Amino acid sequence: MIMNLNYREPIYLARYLKVMRDRLPSQFLISRSVSLDFNKDSPLPELWGLHDDAMKSFRGRMEFVSSMHDLPPPAVSSLLDLKVAIANKILENCHFCERRCGANRKKKRTGYCRLDAVSRYSAEFLHQGEEPELVPSHTIFFTGCNFRCAYCQNWDISQAPRSGIPILPQELARTITLRRAYGSRNVNFVTPTPHTHTILKILNALKVNVPVIWNSNMYYSREIAGLLEGVVDVYLGDMRYGNDECAKKYSNVPDYWNVVTRNFMKAYTGGEILLRQLVLPGHIECCTVPIVKWVKENIPKIRFNLMFQYRPTYRAYEHPEINRSLMPVEIQKALDIVREAGIEDVLI
């Protein structure tokens, strides 16, 4: 990790920092302390009704818990158990992401992400290359993706859904515990959306307090947004495109702007946000400008990471206009846009 002499500790990740230092419990531990009885075989609408009621108890408990000592013990049957049950049912008609393919992944049918019910990861390690406030970050790279980014730097992982190591939730929970003992500041789930069912099971088996990072393209369904509240501490979210046309052209994503802004708004009320804006060559006016404007007007109290790491990889050559690195003038223009907008908590 290269030291940034201009680095300032984030303003709007205050709760995360307290969880990281074991001064507050992670949200998933609070959910696991909320007791409720339910039948996992009940119809999905009935389970959602119970979930909505239990989330009211969760929110009240979140306000009450001001230290680790305030955390009640795990419930025999908990809100987190209910979240696991709901995610497991959604697998039968998959709508984890907003493509809403409807595949029965339990029967090995697949949708756009090409994943069945078995989650796999390609690597897990203490990552030193994330944002300074996150490192060392216990980063777990899941295989598969619901995007098809032409310039994906991890294309060998994202486009090979059947590669990697099959996940046994209890085993990975033990690995997370070990990494935490070795100094990880968080557990960082990368490309998590298609694996929501598995991640909830991992957290339900986890015994250690650790901040949960949802490292995502933010293109998940309303239902998944509801499950993530009460589980995720920091939404490490990409906001790449300022319009639907660019999203469709470079990532084959429909209705990008509505879905992603909706999910950022929901995350803003239920957790903390570290937003990544990867500046694309030739896309200052169409993407960076509207993103910065929207953030300032709608979710101003977030950590904003303006990123200049774009490199033309994978199939970027199919789009000559992005088959190059950023020019210095583009970098300076993006910096000026963010500064003039007055976004307060910026990482560059």
Question: For the regions a protein language model found, what residue spans apply to each?
Answer:
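Long, charge-rich boundary regions
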Residues: 124-167, 175-194
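Short alpha-helix
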Residues: 327-338
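N-terminal alpha-helical interaction blocks
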Residues: 1-80, 86
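Conserved acidic residues
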Residues: 95, 150, 233
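Conserved AdoMet/S-adenosylmethionine-binding subsite of the radical SAM
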Residues: 169-322, 328
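N-terminal [4Fe-4S]-dependent radical SAM core
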Residues: 60-142, 154-161
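A cross-taxonomic marker for long C-terminal extensions/tails that follow the last structured domain
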Residues: 337-348
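Generic secondary-structure signature for well-ordered alpha-helical cores
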Residues: 99-102, 150, 154, 265, ...
